[in-house]
């Protein structure tokens, strides 16, 4: 989980060190660390924005490296030639970052009062021609993406002002380093004051800006997603104790319970809020599409998992997403559509991080026996509906029950259907479900929450309880629950008492939510 922060820290550190080299070439006798840390701070702040692309920070580093190398060229003719070569290369690598480089080149020549400085305007003109030409040729869709850092933000959203701050800091830092007194023989006291003032200013800016831009609300979601990605189900469950007010968190939690086979037994031990917590509403975003694809895959609804994986792949900013490609590989292997799976595998094989995974899954191509023997793909293929139909057209519960009847050994479809009814408080539908399937291979015994719901269906009919083999522990617990309610009927603290003593039961959920 720390690889990402380490990579970002390494990039930002490299930016700070390269900025220092640039500033020292202009003012070699001063440690003006305020100038070379400001871009680092602003780039750090924009990293917190979910819609920002880290490519923008990498491009900024390439710009600084190029500028630092260019400034070390002494001969103005070679310097001009190098700038004219670097600008199109930077545009090819990082788009509008080439404009920041060309502007810095012209500015550096201007503040250096170079006799040939006028000729360096050709670098800026070259960049303008490249940018305009890229839009005219439709290589880039908008002038905004050719000339502004908006290219490194979600294309359909307006970029925040913060994204421009680091870009503005670079030319201002060049000017600041030039105009600041050189002071070769400056006293230690004055130097100490300068460093202290800069240090205080940096600390103040960090104190003001980091809490403002650091999106702590999104952090728990990122944690849950990491544990889901690495299949650490117990960690997800551990992080979801206490109040939960977000359907996305609940979807992660309920998926973890389902993966462990504990959904119908333990779901009411957590802060449930209706059936939306089983499957969050789809909002056409990459995050929710990916989450739903994973949840449907756990559930065995392969068609819906494939649909959500594709939606996630096409809605993510950038050039697709390997996580969704992995799911598309799996779903197509399960369906036996091997040519499509092979196409996606070929894409993943070209990546560094997913090459081994893709190579391993290539072994499943056109190999039904290998798929059926695989612990992940095999059960999913076995649970596919025998008759072709449109998934979800008659409701998810209808599809789940077809699969439950077809593969009774897999208890998740029937338990998930019951969970939908209980969370919706649709007791009539739940009653029809258990009366039809209880005692059959589809539902040989009732999970704990189902037993608790049976008592609510017929609170005074003990024979009805016996029909569904409600356990003695559940009956004794209900007796305590009923006594608590009767004894505190007029007590305004009754909800708190129920929550404290019976908060992990369906009776508490049914009464209080």
Go through each PLM region and give its residues.
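Short hydrophobic alpha-helices at membrane interfaces in multi-pass membrane enzymes
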Residues: 31-37, 60, 71-87, 115-124
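Cytosolic-side transmembrane helix boundary signature
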Residues: 157-198
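Perimembrane helix-loop-helix junctions
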Residues: 100-121
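Internal/C-terminal transmembrane anchor helices
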Residues: 188-215
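Terminal, low-structured helical/coil segments at or just beyond the last alpha-helical repeat
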Residues: 402-407, 411, 420, 462-513
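Membrane-interface micro-motifs in multi-pass membrane enzymes
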Residues: 2-20, 24-74, 93, 97, ...
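Alpha-helical transmembrane segments
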Residues: 20, 67-69, 108-109, 131-135, ...
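Soluble catalytic regions of membrane-associated enzymes that act on cell-envelope
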Residues: 210-381, 405-424
